[in-house]
Amino acid sequence: LITTKYPKDTLDIIAFGNDAWPIEIKDLPYLEVGPYHTNTVAGLDLAVDILRRRKTSNKQIFMITDGKPTCLKEGLKYYKNSFGLDRKIVNKTLDEAAKCRKLGIPITTFMIAKDPYLQRFVREFTKTNNGRAFYSSLSGLGEYIFEDYVRNRRKRLK
C-alpha cells in the first residue's frame, strides 16, 4: 500500500535479534523467530541511521515487539539477560527512545504480549519518545489497546 499509494515514500524493514539487519519486503513472509535475544537498541540505532540518510521530513519508526529488550552489544561482545527487565538494557533502550524524540522521529510500538510488567516498560518507552503504542497478543490481534502520548489518549479498539 505504501509503495503504490505513496510512491515517493520509502519503507525499510529491520529485523532484530542479537543484532539488527535490514530485510527486503519480499523476504518478510519468510522471517522466522530465531534463538535470539532482543537487541532493541541495535534495531532503533539502525533505523535512525537509515532515516538520517533520507531527505524526507516525515520520518517514523514502527516497531513490532514482545516488549522485552534482553540484549546489548558492547564492543565485540553481547550483554544478555533474559530474566526480567535488566536495568542496564532498559536504560540504554530508553536512551534510544529519547534520542529519537530529540531527532523528531516518533516511534509507534505494536506490542504483541500481555505481560503487565512488559506493558509497563512499553508505556515508559512510549512516554519517553512521546510516541504511540498498540497492545495486543498474537491470538487477539483483532482487539488492541491504543495509547497516544501525543494526544494523551488511551482506548480499547476492536
Question: Where does each model-flagged region fall?
Answer:
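Switch/connector loops and helix/strand junctions flanking conserved nucleotide-binding motifs
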Residues: W21-I25, K55, P69-E74, Y117-R120, ...
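Von Willebrand factor A/integrin I-like adhesion domains
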Residues: P106-K158
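Von Willebrand factor
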Residues: L1-I25, G43-L44, S57-I64, T108-Y117
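Small-residue-enriched hydrophobic alpha-helices in membranes
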Residues: D27-Y30
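VWA/integrin I-like adhesion module and closely mimicked acidic/polar interface patches used
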Residues: H37, G67-T128
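Arginine/glycine-rich "motif VI" loop of SF2 helicases in the C-terminal RecA-like domain
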Residues: T3-K8, R52-R53, A98-I105
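Structured catalytic core of nucleotide-sugar glycosyltransferases
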Residues: H37-G43
